């Protein structure tokens, strides 16, 4: 079956010489077409080959969280599919969940280009996209059309971000409007106050600013849908502890750790080839390997602070089985990937899932849930 994967890789997962954003847009449009015409030829055949090549199932990886069934713990992180154009196809790539967005109440074009870069020396990405998206209303329409064609096969989350034009003091109503437009079309929702690419957004992580947002969403959430919070890796331990306490107060379903980092410490890349500027002068968040250790440290801290009572989705620097296992044993029940998937290719998901089953057998564990947080037990 992997004979199909070889030609698909250079088509869908671009070479290091290509324009990252242009190639990304091409891929999303291609996947959208395959999903829309999934019952026609050749799209039906292509989809069957994708599923045969990249999917892996084992009952030892199945978990139930928030009343949702996750066939495996490995998900697609927010940022890859901002407008939900591939929402119906991510399960075919073997993912156990997919998070769409970030989406804002108001449509916005994002920051000027170029704004998406790869740092191959560091196995990292640099992005300053600025939450470019078509807005919550359009995303709701897209998802309604997608779910009318076929039911979703994996849990779908939506990452909610503040619109750039909305003043910080009106952030709560902005998040609520997005949630109100989208609440019928996804399985869980994420409050994103940690992107470094929306001016002032990270200020909303402070307790005084975050509490009104969580309170407003809590009031709006009559159906008690899972609400999670995505946090920055650049917070200090005191701020993290405050956020954990707020998560308990407002009964958040979980915490996603972490978003991208503004730190440039330890990077091998000194100059960004696309601009010729010193990497330290370039705005944006770093993803991938440089984020790996810090995100795992934060996962472990949250797990300890909550005694494992608040589920954690771990994201940041996952490329291999060992990367995934480290985050699970630190306390993550679910995982998300983005940069690692770009560098390693679409078979990364299957390889990691097969490896997790082998790890469970080696450790004498009968189910993945038994591995969550065992580094601290």
Swiss-Prot record:
UniProt keywords, alphabetically: Cell membrane, Flavoprotein, FMN, Membrane, Oxidoreductase, Pyrimidine biosynthesis
Cited function: Catalyzes the conversion of dihydroorotate to orotate with quinone as electron acceptor.
Keyword Membrane annotated: yes
Cofactor field: FMN
Recorded superkingdom: Bacteria
The name this protein goes by in its record: Dihydroorotate dehydrogenase (quinone)
Pathway terms, separated by semicolons: Pyrimidine metabolism; UMP biosynthesis via de novo pathway; orotate from (S)-dihydroorotate (quinone route): step 1/1
Catalytic site: 195
């Amino acid at each position: 079956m992997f004979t199909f994967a070889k030609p698909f890789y250079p088509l869908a997962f671009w070479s290091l010489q290509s324009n990252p954003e242009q190639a990304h847009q091409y891929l999303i449009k291609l996947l959208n077409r395959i999903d829309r015409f999934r019952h026609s030829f050749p799209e039906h055949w292509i989809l069957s080959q994708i599923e045969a090549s990249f999917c892996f199932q084992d009952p030892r990886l199945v978990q139930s969280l928030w009343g949702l069934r996750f066939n495996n713990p490995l998900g697609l992180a927010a940022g890859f599919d901002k407008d939900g154009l591939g929402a119906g196809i991510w399960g075919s790539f073997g993912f156990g969940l997919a998070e769409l967005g970030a989406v804002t109440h108001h449509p916005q074009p994002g920051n000027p280009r170029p704004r998406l870069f790869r740092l191959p020396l560091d196995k990292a990405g640099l992005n300053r996209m600025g939450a470019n998206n078509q807005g919550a209303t359009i995303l709701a329409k897209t998802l309604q059309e997608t779910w009318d064609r076929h039911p979703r096969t994996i849990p779908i989350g939506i990452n909610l971000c503040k619109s750039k034009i909305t003043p910080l003091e009106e952030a709560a109503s902005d998040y609520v409007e997005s949630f109100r437009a989208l609440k019928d079309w996804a399985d869980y929702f994420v409050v994103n106050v940690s992107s470094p690419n929306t001016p002032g957004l990270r200020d909303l992580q402070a307790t005084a600013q975050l509490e009104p947002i969580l309170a407003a969403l809590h009031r709006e959430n009559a159906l008690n849908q899972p609400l999670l919070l995505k946090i920055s890796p650049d917070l200090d331990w005191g701020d993290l502890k405050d956020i954990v306490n707020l998560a308990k107060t407002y009964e958040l379903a979980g915490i996603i750790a972490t978003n991208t980092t503004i730190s440039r410490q330890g990077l091998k890349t000194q100059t960004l080839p696309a601009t010729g500027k010193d990497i330290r002068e370039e705005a944006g968040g770093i993803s991938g390997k440089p984020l790996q250790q810090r995100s795992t440290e934060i996962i472990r801290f949250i797990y300890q602070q909550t005694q494992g009572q608040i589920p954690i989705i771990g994201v940041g620097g996952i490329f291999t089985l060992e990367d995934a296992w480290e985050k699970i044993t630190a306390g993550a029940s679910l995982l998300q990937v983005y940069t690692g998937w770009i560098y390693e290719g679409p078979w990364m998901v299957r390889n990691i899932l097969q490896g997790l089953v082998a790890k469970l057998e080696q450790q004498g564990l009968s189910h993945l849930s038994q591995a969550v947080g065992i580094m601290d037990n």
